Amino acid sequence: MGQKVNPIGLRLGINRNWASRWFPNYQTAPLNISEDHKIRKFLKKELYYAGVSEIIIERTAKKLRVTVVAARPGIIIGKKGADIEKLKEALKKIVDKEISINIKEVKRPQANAQLAAENVTMQLERRVAFRRAMKKVMQAAMKAGAKGIKIKVSGRLAGAEMARTEWYMEGRVPLHTLRAKIDYGFAEAMTTYGIIGAKVWIFKGEVLQKGIQPEKKEEAPARDKEGRGTRRRGRQ
């Protein structure tokens, strides 16, 4: 089950919190969900070059607070906060409430799964070889302190006629362990051959109660797998 399900959704209430935080009722829930989707879609498009990893939306009766977690917060804020005011005016067209926007910086962007997935897709759009792009992102994440990382890409890789899936893994990524802090990200690359999807899982350690010592396990060596049957790749 841990291999198939979204690792963030599986750990909600255990070591992850919700990205939308409000108390719904049967009348307002559909509208709130629709507005949250529109806000996220707008901000991801508008702040693409700021490296947005997460958007947290909190609601009260009359107020809406949006927290944007990004790798380059200066691009969002602008000169003397001018760009923040423009964002507020744009969001008021979507939501008829008093809006406040908070900006948080990602401490280690190389070890953030969403930013890592977007990094892979940006390289693929620049026609970088997919294996090179994956290994480069993996090395950067491990240097930034990740305990393990797994990257999977799917689509017409290297312009092949038949779509396939390939993945690389380094270190430990225990998807079945609920106390494991697993970060997950997904992005798509629009290439001339079609869309290539990239998924990234990053293991950042275990969340334990006080007084409990984690089990010591040896790290697995880096490995890769082609996702079509048992056919092996030829010499590169």
From Swiss-Prot:
Alphabetic keyword roster: Ribonucleoprotein, Ribosomal protein, RNA-binding, rRNA-binding
Record carries keyword Lipid metabolism: no
Signal peptide annotation: none
A Pfam family assignment: KH_2
Record field: compositional bias (Basic and acidic residues): 213-229
Family annotation (InterPro entries): KH_dom, KH_dom-like_a/b, KH_dom_type_2, KH_sf_prok-type, Ribosomal_S3_C_sf, Ribosomal_uS3_bac-typ, Ribosomal_uS3_C, Ribosomal_uS3_CS
HAMAP family: Ribosomal_uS3_B
Subunit structure: Part of the 30S ribosomal subunit. Forms a tight complex with proteins S10 and S14.
Listed name of the protein: Small ribosomal subunit protein uS3
Annotated source species: Wolinella succinogenes (strain ATCC 29543 / DSM 1740 / CCUG 13145 / JCM 31913 / LMG 7466 / NCTC 11488 / FDC 602W)
Gene: rpsC
